[in-house]
Amino acid sequence: MRHRLSGRQLNRNASHRQAMFRNMASSLVRHEIIKTTLPKAKELRRVVEPLITLAKSDSVANRRLAFARTRDRDVVGKLFTELGPRFQGRPGGYTRILKCGFRAGDNAPMAYIELVGRPVDAEAVTEE
């Protein structure tokens, strides 16, 4: 029985899943928007949101915790210098998931996951 088992397996063993979400979380922090499958996006929220909450209070201990979870020095720097102050007044809900259809090869549901206060390039969104 699967009583009290949380999280999705995603057809991966534990170390593969941990490495995948560590890489995806680093990419999301670095680029502030990524495209992935819908189940991975929903599960990625559970990894990224606590990282941003951790970054709201800057301390050496919190930076070490964030580094232990991401293993990327640049990502830790961006978390504590940009994202922590940006989300200081927001009590959670730092990510948004937008569904974007189905993948051509295997019809998997795809989604964009982005950070909520993401600056949008005005010149990139032009109507023709």
Swiss-Prot record:
GO molecular function: structural constituent of ribosome
Stored InterPro entries: Ribosomal_bL17, Ribosomal_bL17_CS, Ribosomal_bL17_sf
Keywords from the named record: Ribonucleoprotein, Ribosomal protein
Domain of life: Bacteria
Pfam family, one: Ribosomal_L17
Gene Ontology CC entries for this record: cytosolic large ribosomal subunit
Subunit and interaction comment: Part of the 50S ribosomal subunit. Contacts protein L32.
Entry protein name: Large ribosomal subunit protein bL17
Protein source organism: Tolumonas auensis (strain DSM 9187 / NBRC 110442 / TA 4)
